[in-house]
Curated annotation (Swiss-Prot):
Residues 88-109, 226-311 are annotated as: Disordered. Expressed in the pharynx, nerve cords, the H-shaped excretory cell, vulva muscles, and the anal depressor (at protein level). Expressed in the intestine (at protein level). In males, it is also expressed in the spicules and hyp7 cells of the hypodermis (at protein level). This is Helix-loop-helix protein 11. It comes from Caenorhabditis elegans. Transcriptional regulator. Component of a feedback loop involving atfs-1, atgl-1 and hlh-11. Binds to the promoter of the atgl-1 lipase to negatively regulate the expression of atgl-1, and thereby promoting fat oxidation in response to mitochondrial stress and mitochondrial respiration in the intestine. In addition, functions with atfs-1 to maintain lifespan. May have a role in fertility and in positively regulating body size. GO terms for cellular component: nucleus. The keyword Ribosomal protein does not apply. Keywords: DNA-binding, Nucleus, Transcription, Transcription regulation. GO terms for molecular function: DNA-binding transcription factor activity, RNA polymerase II-specific; protein dimerization activity; RNA polymerase II cis-regulatory region sequence-specific DNA binding. The gene is hlh-11. It comes from the Eukaryota.
C-alpha cells in the first residue's frame, strides 16, 4: 500500500517534469533563452521511494517526501537538462535557486506566458515597422502626405517595375549601356537667339543714348544763347584782315547764329574764308583818287541754309572801323553809312562772282565819270545767274544801275533772276 502511494507520487513528479519540459521548449522556440527551473534533489526523492513500509506509513511517507523536497537545495539548470537524472545528481548543491514554476498557481503561470508572447510580438512589429519606414524613405515624399503600409508596398512595387523598364531601355540586349546624346544643336540655337536679342536691345539703347546726348547738346547751346542774349544790344566791331575784308569775332559768330545753323566747334565760319564756308567777302575796285576808296564795296555771301536771313545794305563811314550790331538771326547795322554799300546776298558760283566784279567795276566807273552808258558784258558769262549792286548815292548811279540791269536781262533772257528780293528776305536800308 505504501509503495503504491510512492509510485503515484513519482508519477506526479515525472508528469510535472515533462510538463516543464514542454513549457521550456515553447519558451526556447520564442527566443527567450534558458528559463530557471527548480527541481527537487534526486537523492531525497530516492530515499523517500526506498523507505521500508514498516517504518513509515502512507501519510508519513508523503510528509517525508514533501519535507525532503522543501528542505533540499535548489539549483538552476538549463532546459536541456530537465528530466535527466544523472546530470541533476552531478549538479553542485551550493547554488540556491528560485521557486519552481510547479510551485506557482496556474494564473501566475498563464500571466508569465502572456508577457513572454507580448514581448515577442512587440519585437516582431518593431522590425516590420522599421522595414516600412525604410521603404517610405525611398519613395517620393509630398508635404503632409500619410501612407498606410499597403500604400507603401504598392508604390514600392510600382517604382521597382519602373526602374526595371528604364534599365531595359538603357541597356540593350548586348549588355552595353547606351551613350546619352546631348542636344547640342538645340542648346546652341537657344544661345544664338538669346545673343541676337541682347544685341538688338543694346543697339536700341545706344541709339536712344545718342539721341538724348544730341538733345542735351542742343539744350546747352540754347542755354548759352539765352545767357549771351544780353550781349546782343552791345555793338560788335569787325576785325580787319590783310586782304581788305572784315571778320566778326569767333565767339559772336558761334553764339549769334541759331543752333541748327551752327557748325561744329572744330570749324567755325569766318567771313574771309571763300572756299570752306558759304560766307565770302568780295572787294570791289573803286577809283584810287576818290575819297571813298577807304571803304570800298564788299559783298557778303551768307550760307544757303539761311532763307530767312534779311538782306541789309550797309553804308560805311569814311573813318574805320565799321561798327556792326546784330540783334537777331537777321543782320543789321545801326551806324550811319555814306559810301558804297555792302550787300548780303545768297551764295553764287565763282563765275557769277566774276559777273559781280564786272558789274561793280562798271558802277564804280559810272560813279567816277558821271556817264550812264550801258556796259557790254563778255559773251562767256551768258547763261549764268547774276545779281546786281543797288546803290543810291545819286541819280547818275541809279541810271547806270538801270543800264546794267537791262544789259543783264538782254544777255541772259529767261534765266534772269528778278531784281526784287525773295519773299523770305527783307531789304532794310540803314542811314
Amino acid at each position: 500500500m505504501v509503495r503504491s502511494d510512492s509510485a503515484e507520487e513519482d508519477q506526479i513528479i515525472i508528469d510535472d517534469g515533462f510538463d516543464l519540459t514542454e513549457e521550456d521548449e515553447e519558451m526556447m522556440s520564442s527566443g527567450t533563452g534558458a528559463l530557471p527551473v527548480t527541481i527537487a534533489d534526486w537523492n531525497s526523492v530516492t530515499n523517500a521511494r526506498m523507505a521500508p513500509p514498516s517504518i513509515m506509513s502512507a501519510a508519513s511517507a508523503f510528509d517525508l517526501t514533501a519535507s525532503g523536497m522543501q528542505n533540499s537545495l535548489r539549483s538552476v539548470l538549463p532546459t536541456s537538462t530537465i528530466g535527466h537524472a544523472p546530470m541533476l545528481a552531478n549538479r553542485s548543491l551550493s547554488q540556491p535557486a528560485p521557486l519552481s514554476p510547479t510551485s506557482l498557481d496556474p494564473d501566475r503561470r498563464s500571466r508569465m506566458r502572456r508577457q513572454i508572447a507580448n514581448c515577442n510580438e512587440r519585437r516582431r512589429m518593431q522590425s516590420i515597422n522599421a522595414g516600412f519606414l525604410a521603404l517610405r524613405a525611398l519613395l517620393p515624399r509630398k508635404e503632409g502626405e500619410k501612407l498606410s503600409k499597403a500604400a507603401i508596398l504598392q508604390q514600392t512595387a510600382d517604382m521597382v517595375h519602373q526602374l526595371l523598364g528604364h534599365k531595359g531601355e538603357d541597356i540593350p540586349d548586348g549588355g552595353e549601356p547606351k551613350k546619352l546624346k546631348l542636344e547640342e544643336d538645340h542648346h546652341d540655337a537657344d544661345h544664338q537667339a538669346q545673343i541676337a536679342h541682347l544685341q538688338t536691345i543694346l543697339e536700341t539703347e545706344r541709339a536712344a543714348r545718342k539721341a538724348l546726348e544730341s538733345q542735351v547738346i542742343q539744350l546747352r547751346e540754347l542755354l548759352q544763347m539765352t545767357t549771351t542774349s544780353s550781349q546782343a544790344s552791345s555793338p560788335v566791331t569787325p576785325r580787319s584782315n590783310g586782304s581788305g575784308g572784315f571778320t566778326l569775332p569767333s565767339s559772336y559768330a558761334s553764339s549769334a547764329l541759331p543752333t541748327p545753323l551752327r557748325e561744329s566747334p572744330e570749324r567755325k565760319p569766318s567771313f574771309q574764308d571763300t572756299t570752306s564756308t558759304p560766307l565770302s567777302l568780295l572787294t570791289l575796285n573803286g577809283s584810287p583818287t576818290s575819297s571813298e576808296s577807304l571803304a570800298s564795296q564788299r559783298i557778303f555771301h551768307p550760307p544757303p541754309t539761311l532763307p530767312s536771313l534779311e538782306t541789309t545794305v550797309i553804308r560805311p563811314t569814311p573813318l574805320p572801323p565799321i561798327s556792326v550790331e546784330i540783334s537777331s538771326p537777321s543782320l543789321s547795322t545801326p551806324s550811319p553809312l555814306t559810301a558804297a554799300p555792302i550787300i548780303f546776298s545768297t551764295a553764287v558760283p565763282t563765275q557769277s562772282s566774276i559777273l559781280f566784279q564786272t558789274a561793280a567795276a562798271a558802277v564804280t566807273s559810272a560813279m567816277s565819270t558821271g556817264n550812264s552808258t550801258p556796259v557790254a558784258l563778255p559773251h562767256h558769262l551768258q547763261g549764268h545767274n547774276s545779281a546786281f549792286v543797288s546803290t543810291q548815292p545819286s541819280l547818275t548811279l541809279s541810271q547806270s544801275m538801270q543800264t546794267i540791269v537791262e544789259a543783264i536781262r538782254h544777255l541772259e533772257g529767261s534765266h534772269f533772276i528778278p531784281t526784287s528780293p525773295p519773299p523770305t528776305s527783307q531789304t532794310s536800308l540803314v542811314r
